């Protein structure tokens, strides 16, 4: 690997700079179009009265509600997935065209099918519980379903790295692929006071699908682990990867995970309540036209999903603002936890972000509106500026999080 160049600001070669700006504009439009198209898909399902057809099939199959759910839910989830395929296909073609994805269409199709299968299994469980709660408490379902969904969400977060992620990617012990990196990560984790032993540090094969770079910490409790993509190992130095992993470790040390879970739960409660307040009005106005008997009818689900999608999208800027704050804190933690372990840790961090931005074609000058609406991380230029300016030690001070 070539010696990393000294970074003073985020810059790209002219050809890649142009590509990055163009890709940013495309993603901006796609986000808006994708949201509107998702609403259009749900409206089509309501307009074509597909949900009542699936409900009738489910009710003819069995008088037992849980068996009805196992017929109705997969049919509706698969229908939504198929109708949303055009936007998914277009997004993948854009990623391939800009060189971010190298995944062939057959492999991509297989991943899509796996994703739909997971969605059908998980979605059926949630839908079954949702309508059981609605039938028992038509006026308080939004609160009781929220309570029930929290532990289920935590369980999914726990099992995702153990069961779901291996469905889509190959994993191997990191120590078998890069013993030097494993030792460096172990040193950083020890300094952070986190319990992530080498046997829970993994290499992930991403190169057959993507050119993007990534390293992350995932899971909770016994499933917590560090994952480093093979593309990252190929294009970043060990100190740069340690900084990225230090950033990710910061999310755990600074309790960002429970904080975000609590905040996300609060947002979810608001979304459910707004859905409850509006679904009755919607069904009174259009329920007969759509073939929906009432809120406890399986066929009401597309209408409820349409409302929840709108409210979630409207609240996304609030969620993103909180996320950007936590990501900035994690950047600061990554600088502090690698200070003393890595010479010139600020420059190393800037080099890491330069590499990430270059490969991922990060926009050199995103508009404030784009950042406000859609960025859940600070922009790459802002992150590099912070890394190059944050140095409390030169003034005789110490880090805020790591002393």
Say what each PLM segment does.
Residues 295-304:
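N-terminal signal-anchor/signal peptide hydrophobic helix marking the start
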């Amino acid at each position: 690997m070539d010696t990393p160049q000294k970074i003073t600001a985020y810059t790209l070669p002219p050809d890649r700079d142009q590509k990055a700006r163009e890709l940013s504009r495309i993603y901006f439009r796609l986000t808006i179009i994708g949201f509107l198209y998702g609403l259009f898909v749900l409206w089509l399902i309501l307009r074509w009265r597909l949900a009542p057809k699936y409900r009738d099939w489910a009710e003819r199959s069995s008088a037992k509600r849980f068996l009805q759910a196992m017929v109705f839910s997969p049919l509706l989830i698969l229908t939504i997935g198929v109708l949303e395929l055009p936007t998914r296909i277009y997004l993948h073609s854009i990623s391939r065209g800009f060189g971010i994805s190298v995944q062939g269409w057959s492999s991509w199709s297989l991943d899509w099918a796996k994703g739909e299968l997971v969605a059908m299994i998980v979605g059926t469980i949630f839908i079954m519980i949702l309508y059981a709660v609605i039938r028992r408490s038509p006026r308080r379902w939004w609160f009781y379903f929220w309570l029930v969904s929290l532990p289920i969400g935590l369980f999914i977060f726990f099992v995702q790295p153990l069961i779901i992620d291996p469905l889509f990617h190959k994993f191997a012990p990191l120590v078998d692929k890069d013993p030097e990196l494993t030792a460096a990560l172990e040193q950083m984790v020890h300094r952070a006071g986190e319990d992530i032993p080498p046997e829970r540090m993994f290499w992930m094969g991403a190169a057959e699908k993507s050119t993007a770079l990534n390293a992350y910490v995932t899971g909770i409790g016994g499933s917590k682990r560090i994952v480093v993509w093979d593309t990252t190992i190929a294009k970043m130095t060990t100190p740069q990867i340690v900084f990225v992993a230090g950033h990710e470790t910061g999310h755990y040390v600074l309790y960002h995970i429970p904080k975000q879970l609590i905040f996300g739960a609060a947002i979810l409660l608001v979304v459910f309540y707004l859905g409850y307040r509006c679904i009755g009005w919607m069904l009174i106005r259009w329920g007969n036209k759509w073939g929906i008997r009432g809120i406890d009818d399986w066929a009401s689900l597309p209408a409820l999903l349409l409302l929840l999608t709108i409210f979630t999208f409207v609240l996304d800027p609030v969620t993103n603002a909180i996320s950007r704050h936590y990501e900035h804190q994690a950047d600061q933690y990554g600088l502090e936890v690698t200070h003393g372990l890595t010479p010139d840790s600020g420059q190393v961090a800037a080099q890491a972000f330069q590499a990430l931005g270059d490969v991922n074609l990060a926009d050199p000058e995103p508009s404030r509106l784009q950042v406000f609406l859609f960025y859940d991380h600070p922009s790459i230029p802002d992150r590099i500026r912070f890394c190059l300016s944050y140095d409390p030690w030169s003034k005789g001070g110490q880090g805020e999080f790591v002393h």
